């Protein structure tokens, strides 16, 4: 089983070009299945049956695994069996027809518009670190980039004159995104201080030593900005969520937001409609004369 898992991981890395983060998550999930099979005396992937996989899912659920984690595990198993079937190594899929236990869908945390502007409109010193960090914040919020997409940006991916940036998303899929006026200005100010010829690679966001900033360093800079400007915890994905929520709230164009976020399935994007409804419901409750609740009543 381990040998076939290694072959599948090599297929994901070399042919599907999945990210190392996704590859590691799938490997961990499939190693859990192997561990379970070993304890149950199941000799190989071809011997694993649907009722046994259902038992594993139930056990993981009782141990506190979230519905999202279990859905990912089942996705990893389905992907493996598709590969095994295609290679002629197996002729069934025990995950077919199985679904993860349903759980509460947590809505993503977002900044409201006023808080986003408070974060971005603070004064910026004209120095290397301040200009770089401001450009990072503006680009996250302007274009809805994932952390990995911003980390991997090279100078050749920018066309600030046209207000565009090209990113490489999940599964190696490229997409071109608009860059707003404020973000373009912040990027131009940063590139002026960054210099074009000095650093040894073409990374857009670099350290003083000329090295590409890694994901952890960018997370820490965003966190520091959140604490300094807002007095709250802030992470890159919250800026992506805020971008999506605010664009959807203004445009009501779910398909456009899906394309900008790089979601393969529109159901992933639809979670932002729940956020928009929350906002509308709050406005209604506070503004409609027949909606205002009397003090001390629950209905």
From Swiss-Prot:
Classification via InterPro entries: CB (IPR044068), DNA_brk_join_enz (IPR011010), Integrase-like_cat_sf (IPR013762), Integrase_catalytic (IPR002104), Integrase_recombinase_N (IPR010998), Integrase_SAM-like_N (IPR004107), Recomb_XerC (IPR011931), Tyrosine_recombinase_XerC/XerD (IPR023009)
Listed Gene3D superfamilies: 1.10.150.130, Intergrase catalytic core
Localization (cell): Cytoplasm
Cellular component, GO annotation: cytoplasm
Presence of the UniProt keyword Lipoprotein in the record: no
Any one GO molecular-function label of the UniProt entry: DNA binding
Pfam families found in the cross-reference section: Phage_int_SAM_1, Phage_integrase
PROSITE patterns, per database record: CB, TYR_RECOMBINASE
Catalytic site positions: 146, 170, 237, 240, 263, 272 (o-(3'-phospho-dna)-tyrosine intermediate)
Phosphoprotein among keywords: no
Annotated ranges, domain Core-binding (CB): 1-85
Domain Tyr recombinase: 106-285
GO biological process assignments: cell division; chromosome segregation; DNA transposition
Keywords, sorted A to Z: Cell cycle, Cell division, Chromosome partition, Cytoplasm, DNA integration, DNA recombination, DNA-binding
Function per UniProt: Site-specific tyrosine recombinase, which acts by catalyzing the cutting and rejoining of the recombining DNA molecules. The XerC-XerD complex is essential to convert dimers of the bacterial chromosome into monomers to permit their segregation at cell division. It also contributes to the segregational stability of plasmids.
NCBIfam families given in the database record: PRK00283.1 (NF001399), recomb_XerC (TIGR02224)
Family: Belongs to the 'phage' integrase family. XerC subfamily.
Subunit description: Forms a cyclic heterotetrameric complex composed of two molecules of XerC and two molecules of XerD.
Record-given protein name: Tyrosine recombinase XerC
Species whose genome carries this gene: Pseudomonas putida (strain W619)
Lineage: Bacteria, Pseudomonadati, Pseudomonadota, Gammaproteobacteria, Pseudomonadales
